[in-house]
Every structure is written in structure tokens, then in C-alpha cells.
Amino acid sequence: MLIAFVGKGGVGKTTVSSAFALQLSKKGKTAIVSSDFMSSLRYVFPSDPTGLKVVEMKENEVSAAWKERYGNEVTTVLKQFFDVEPWIVDHIADSPGVAEEFMISNIVDLDNSGEYDYVVWDTAASSATMHLLMLEKEFYEHLDRDVKILLRLRDRFHTDKVMELIEQWKNLAKGVWKKLEETSFYLVTTGDELSLLQASEIDHDFRRMGLRIHDRICNRCKAETENSYALRIPEFSGTARQIVEMISSGHELKLPIISGKRNQP
């Protein structure tokens, strides 16, 4: 089960996602992963707690993984149009957006692996996350157009390998987007006016993309803040780990109901 926490920068997404990852680790095997290349998860969890795997992805590692997974396939496609030297794959792997797009695929693979009952996704600040999700959606739609174009150029190719690869990429992208549609997104905000405004914009953008916010969480919530949140978390003081443990022990995350019952291992 993939559970993601989204919201503007500075509202405490890492703290909240860490708290509920810790809570879920008591119910089943759990992983927490960040899509922020400057993640602070290891500051919260210097070592993995029992039942919880902390996964941080570095940009160079994600680019290298993309090259290993898709490098030969990209070369096969490009060679149908012009001569390709080995360095071109390195260039593509380091291009803006490639590592970010492949990161979502890695997170989905983590959930699909069956190794974990819960995968908690600590997203980057809202602008970066919305760009990431839109990139994934456009990638899928772009591949759909590519297939139609390549069908017109089919006679040019000496092999059906190119069409097979593009179809394979399209199916992979479709699978990733389907998983995002099934993901339980929790919108984290604070009670200040700017955070509430941006939370409303995030919710609107999610709806526009066909994704759904499962619940809203008010972090560092004041008594006068409107009472329309699934969870209201007061402001705590202490170290990052102490705050995470206080939230985890005092507030229960409401998981979505699947097939008439709560999704639990």
C-alpha cells in the first residue's frame, strides 16, 4: 500500500510522514522513501527502527539506475534514426527531469515488490512534487502519441524491436500512473493563511490530474484553526525524533477502506 504526504515546504511533511511510518511499522513491514534529493530522513532516523526501512535516493544513483535499466533500449531506438555514440546515453541520463521521472517508477517498484505492507512516500515541497506528477502524466501521454507516430514510420525500421520497446515503455508508464491513482495522498498543512491557500491550490491541481487527496492533516495546529481536518496535530517541542515519536504515539492515521475493510497485513 502506497501512502504519500504532500504539501508546501515547511509544513512538516517529513516529520508527519516519519511519525506515521513509525506507527505503521508496528502493524506491518514498512518502508519510508523521500523524493527530495536533499532528504532529511536520516536526520530523523540515523539507523532503521525495527520494522521500518529508510530509503533515500540520490540524484546520481537514480540517473545511474536509469542508464542501467534503459540505456541499451534507448540506444536501440535512436539507432533507427542516426548513428549513436555511447556518450549520448550518459547525456540523456543526466538531462533535466530524467532522474525525477524515474524516481517515481522506483517508488512504485518498491511498493509492487511485495516486500513491504506499507510504503510511505515523503514528497518534496509542493511545487517540485506537482511538477514531478505532471511530468509522469505527460510522459505517459507523450508515449501514446509516439506509438501513433511510429506506426506511420514503421516501414522505415528494419525490425519490430523499436515498436516493441515503445509499447513496453508505454505499458510501464501506464502502470505507474495507475498506481498513482490508487495511492492514498494526505495533504499536510499548517493553520496559517498562506499554507491554507496553497493547500487549496494543491487539492485543485490533484483533482485536475485525476488524483485524489484522501485526507487533510493540520500540523502545528492551533486551537482556533477550523475543525475540518482528519487529524489535528498540536505543536510539540523537542528533537526531531522526539516529536516524531510523540505524534506517532498520540495520533492514529486513518487508512482508506479497501474492499469493505481496512487494508492491513
Explain the meaning of each model-derived region.
Residues 40-43, 62-66, 127-131, 224-225, ...:
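Switch/connector loops and helix/strand junctions flanking conserved nucleotide-binding motifs
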Residues 81-187:
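Phosphate/Mg2+-binding loops and adjacent switch elements
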Residues 1-5, 30, 117-121, 185, ...:
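Generic beta-sheet signal
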Residues 3-62, 123, 132-137:
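Walker A/P-loop NTP-binding active-site region of P-loop NTPases
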Residues 48-50, 174-265:
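C-terminal lobe/tail of nucleotide-utilizing enzymes
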